[in-house]
Amino acid sequence: MSNEISRNWPAPAKLNLFLHINGRRADGYHELQTLFQFIDCCDLLDFRVTQTPEQILHSDMSAVVADSDNLILRAAKSLQQATGYPGGAEIWLEKRLPMGGGLGGGSSDAATTLVALNQLWDTQLSNDELATIGLKLGADIPVFIRGFAAFAEGVGERLQAVTPTEFWYLVIAPDAHVSTAAVFQDPLLPRNTPKLGIDTLMSQPWANDCQDLVVSKYPQVAKALAWLLEYAPSRMTGTGACVFGEFSSQQQALAALAKLPSDMQGFVAKGMNISPLIVRLNRP
């Protein structure tokens, strides 16, 4: 087994179809309500089980490999420590998703690492156990482990499966890095959106409570969102910088992409209520 490479484990992006900030807890974390949906644009990871306990990461992005605090390595080590597995893994990351854009790429990479190595190491942890490990590494990781579109509450850890419409999306990645920590620490961030039941939230217009703040501070995000709103209902995902517009067909999304100004970068993706990772996990 140590010489075999298990290939093409997807780490899909997510969109926050809405994001409401309901308050700040005593520990500094924020209470929120959000709706996660996956899209079919993914990072790809390959794994090789090794007899030695080290975790080795390769990537086409040198900045990822140079980061000793990388979530992929932390996830592998956390699973190893939780299970006492004596071996290790060599991991290859093909980075396709924009970094720091609100698409959850780092969290998704970590979740795919936990799910894949749990199978390849035959450590037999349940999804609940994997999600518990993942939550210690990042609040978004459990939704990627569980692999279904979800309404999330709390700090994002309480998940309820939902089936929003699987639209086609045009995602624009502005040339801006938005610090999630800075957004949540900003005194101008709204923190008083009333908590509502899921049925009410699913039936009313969707919004992102972080959007106005980020748009006011990042002209690149404001420009991308203003352009996209000319073609479709559009919002920011997470704390940005990525924005997305929803279309009823791939043809419509591609037609808008063809008009994208030359100083913007974007891609078309399909909404998915079941993660590509779950499809890969269940493959023979």
From Swiss-Prot:
Q: Which UniProt keywords apply?
A: ATP-binding, Isoprene biosynthesis, Kinase, Nucleotide-binding, Transferase
GO MF terms listed in the record are:
4-(cytidine 5'-diphospho)-2-C-methyl-D-erythritol kinase activity; ATP binding
**Could you tell me the Gene Ontology terms of the biological process aspect for this record?**
isopentenyl diphosphate biosynthetic process, methylerythritol 4-phosphate pathway; terpenoid biosynthetic process
Show the stretches that span the lipid bilayer.
Answer: none
What function does this protein fulfil?
Catalyzes the phosphorylation of the position 2 hydroxy group of 4-diphosphocytidyl-2C-methyl-D-erythritol.
What protein family does this chain belong to?
Belongs to the GHMP kinase family. IspE subfamily.
- Report the NCBIfam families cross-referenced here: ispE
Supply the name of the protein.
4-diphosphocytidyl-2-C-methyl-D-erythritol kinase
Q: Which gene encodes it?
A: ispE
